[in-house]
Amino acid sequence: MEQNLSKTPIKWRASAIVLAICLVLMVVTSVIGHNIQTSGGTVRTEELTFTTDVGATSHAKLYISETATAETPAPAILLCHGYTASLDAMESNAIELSRRGYVVMALDMYGHGESTLPPDGYKQAEMGNVENYAPDLGSYSALQQFKNYDFIDLTKIGMLGHSMGTAAIQEGAYLAYSKWQAAYTAAYAEALAAGSDETTAAYTAYGAAMNSGIVLPGSMVLTGYNYNVRNINDLTYNGVTAENGVFPLYAAPINICTIQGTYDEFSGLLWGVEDSSQYTTSFKFAYGTGGATNVPSGTYFMYGDASATPLTREEAVTAAASAAVTMKPIRAAYSFNGTHSDTYYDETAIGYGIDFFDITLRGGVATIAPTEQVWHGRAACGLIGLIATLVAFVALALTLLRVPFFSTIVRPAAPSISTVHGAKGVIGYIIPYIIFLLPAPLLYYWLIGYPYYMQPQWFKFLTKFMPNSFFNMAPMNSLMLFNGVVGGVFLVLYLLVFFLIGRKKGANLETTGLKLPFTQILKSLLLAVLSFAGIYAVVYACSALSGTNFSFFKFNIMPMDSTHWVAFFKYLPVWLLFFLLCGVIYNSLTRINNAPAWLNYLLCAVVSCGGLAMMFAYDYGKLFATGVRGIQYIPGTTSPEWLAAVGMSFPTALAGIMLFGLLFILPITAVMSRVLHKKAGSVWLGGFLTAFIVLVFTISHMVISI
């Protein structure tokens, strides 16, 4: 039987020791992570902000190798992350490239991280002067920042993007070459007007364009995204087919490599090929390569060679080096065993990118073999630091609960509704338990939709709660809708169980864990705020001192800027209500009075996300078995009526990726809720604190949509 620890003195020394260990781990992982990030001090990092061509404030991070000097300038590479991420997501690439001597700039895209959205009314001439349209997301202006550093070789510039970032770098490169072409055209016309013949005018114009100060990329790595193929009729991305497409960079001498996971969830949407392992059969691939199709992974070939005749490494090096003269750049195609997001943390994918840059920017010289990678240590530090942070929130709350002012919160916990005896009791418990598992998976994809909304790109996909000036984060709006609807269903189910079953067992308000004097509720709130703020202050300090964050894959708790803090408080009420309700369910219904503590922890963890986990297992299990996900499209978007009205079905890919984070944080906070209920005797402290934690976990890296 689980012991009611709220009746015994709080073991504050144990919680204080755990707190101390967590704080030490947070500091140590930050120090070690910084050492790995800077390659033992041979790479220095700098933060920079700049105003872009459309008036936004962009934030970036430079990684500068000690070998990059004015006397020996180094090649430079711009890294651009995907949607709902920040420049930290590109850290593994930044570490590996910078330790090989490249100067690296990792950029926060518009509305992500510490970069703002452009002010209303901006235009880009190269994009048709369409108001409020800047699809490069700041990548063009970031590219131009390279000319401010004398330790960068401006003839050897690369760009690497992931997903949305891949779309953005293609737009940024297009802007750069369009501006170069405009400078050339103006100088050519001026030379002709001055009496030069066409040959002399062309020579003069070329020199003028090259001296115009426009930084041009010569090498690009596209990961998790297609070639940006436009409709040749209106140069938009609407209605692109195999018959009407054009690749805007077809005339630019840029060597380009594509790297695609064989299980990429977005393949159908982006490439038009459901099985991502077959992405080179896409018409978009053919447009981007000048006609090649069905190209084996690892093949280097010339742009325009429809047969994709393989080049040796030496031939690829020679062709890449002369691309600006011959106007015949190379192409390369790679696949790796992974999903869309795995590109951030996959040795093979990272190695392919390194090797391509070595071939196209360094004449094939590899200072360190592409397979020799050390970013794993930094990733491990991020994960350990993140887990230590999560535990520290609770450890500090339990430690402060010993303080006389807060100790008045503590009271004996009321028994749960659930007591299990015999087979009948087991069945009586299992039935409602299973019922509570069902709403989340049944409603998840339908409620979350495809919450991609990037105002500068004009991409506004299906979401039932579009962002607005108040709730301005599309993914957070979808999660808020999910919390509200599923929370409402949970409330109805709980009330039915409470009044139909619980009341017969003597359940009352005290059973719910909500009965607490108002002053003690306020104290619980204050304790949760102090615990959250105290540990979050350490997160800020560790980030400021080390230049690293507690992040791993899709799991993040990182410092927030003022814009994110404002959003935090706007979304907070819904999170508070949802996690207070969850606390009531975990501790007054899921908890079994006569079960051991470990079993109750497990039951709470499973009920928090078990239904979602089973849906996830089916969805991704089928993906790994067949190459196509089990649940491909959002319910309701595949009917003939929908297709006739909208023209396309919407994939569940983005919602599926968002699910990774939920499956990580929900069971952890369910256990937190159970621990804090055992110690305090009510659900208030746990409800408040877990709401803060889950919200900062989801919002600290979230995109500002408008």
Regions found by a protein language model. Give the residues of each.
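Membrane-interfacial, low-structure loops and terminal tails that flank and connect transmembrane helices
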Residues: 2-6, 195, 405-424, 504-523, ...
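Juxtamembrane interface at the cytosolic side of transmembrane helices
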Residues: 388-434
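Juxtamembrane/start-of-transmembrane alpha-helix segments at the extracytoplasmic/lumenal side
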Residues: 372-386
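Hydrophobic H-region at the start of alpha-helical membrane spans
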Residues: 13-23, 385-389, 431-435, 485
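An N-terminal hydrophobic leader/cap segment in hydrolases
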Residues: 8-51, 59-61
